[in-house]
Amino acid sequence: MSRIAVLGSGAWGTAIALALSRRGGHQIFLWSHSQEEASTIAGARENTLFLPGFLLPASIHVTANPNPIAQAEMVVSVVPSEFLRPTIARLQAYFRPGQVVVSATKGIEHASCLRMTQVIASALDVLPPAPTAPNPDTCLEVFTEPDAPEVSSSGIEAAPTFLDRLDLDFGALSGPSFALEVAQGQPTALTVAFQNPAVAARVQQEFASETLRLYTSTDVVGVELGGALKNVIAIAAGVAAGAGLGYNSAAALMTRGIAEITRLAVACGGQRETLAGLSGVGDLVLTCTGSLSRNRTVGQALGQGRKLPEILASLGGKVAEGVLTARAALELARRHQIEMPITEQMELILNEGKDPREAIKDLMLRPGKDER
């Protein structure tokens, strides 16, 4: 029996736990940062706050105790991007050598421009500390080789710490997947990416069921950036819908949106083909058109003239990752000298209060370009 810890008891974390339970043969620990929340879910055997209507089977153990993390062969992180670093730092002592760590959060850390697998590695001291403020000159988009081991005056290497010995595999799970539909058991296909294809194949097998199919990849960069950046384009699609624009506009935004996502992903080391798959075009189409998309919902409300603080408050504690991703994505694009006009206009709407209709007009009046 495999022991799997799911970090984050929101809608997506709960849906992943339910999907894993359908596979059978797993002991699943759904970890919450809040003892009160964990007790409520465990008592009701249902996540009444974030994903009501689904009974949690006996194979899912809901807890706020971090000890089960140390017992797990696989850790699936579904913690929202803005809380990921402090959460992993808090749980650092419970990670152990040989674990497989899967990030299922779609975002980019605002302060560092790091992808989610990089944030986890950084919080575990595998990467250098992140900077405290966004800066295109200090955004880190690649892993850095660790420093050479310290050597004492006697010439003997210093004894390794726990984290020096920590040998973890980091990967990403992404693709078109509304939590509600995954929880309902509707057929869903996702991509799981690890640099080591054998580890990706292992995760694929652990998740596989008649309702969930995983495809493997070694392109962690492309899979993560596709999942994160499409949220910004989904906000743009919502803005267009809220402003009363039609299908022509939506098609243009999605097509040009995947073009700018691909440019940045390739510049960061991703593969163009990845963005044509489930974690790129697939996720983009779903999030830009589906009524269950929180990012599209936020954009639609903005297009109707509502203010961002009011919109976010109406989400009932759920997170629209694109709101936080826009600025970090733009900083990363500036570092790599990549044009991302849609992302730029969304950042101005979200963070500078630009009128959505002015943003749409400015996109249309940009100088003529070749289609690439």
PLM region spans:
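NAD(P)+-binding Rossmann beta1-loop-alpha1 motif at the extreme N-terminus of oxidoreductases
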Residues: 1-54, 61-64, 90, 139, ...
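Electropositive phosphate-/nucleotide-binding environments in soluble metabolic enzymes
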Residues: 10, 14, 22, 31, ...
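Rossmann-like NAD(P)(H) cofactor-binding subdomain of soluble oxidoreductases
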Residues: 56, 62, 67-70, 74-77, ...
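Internal alpha-helical scaffold of NAD(P)-dependent oxidoreductase catalytic cores
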Residues: 94, 119, 124-131, 160-169, ...
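General beta-strand structural signal in soluble alpha/beta enzymes
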Residues: 103, 169-174, 214-218, 276-277, ...
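NAD(P)-dependent Rossmann-like dehydrogenase/reductase catalytic/cofactor-binding core
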Residues: 230, 237-241, 266-276, 280, ...
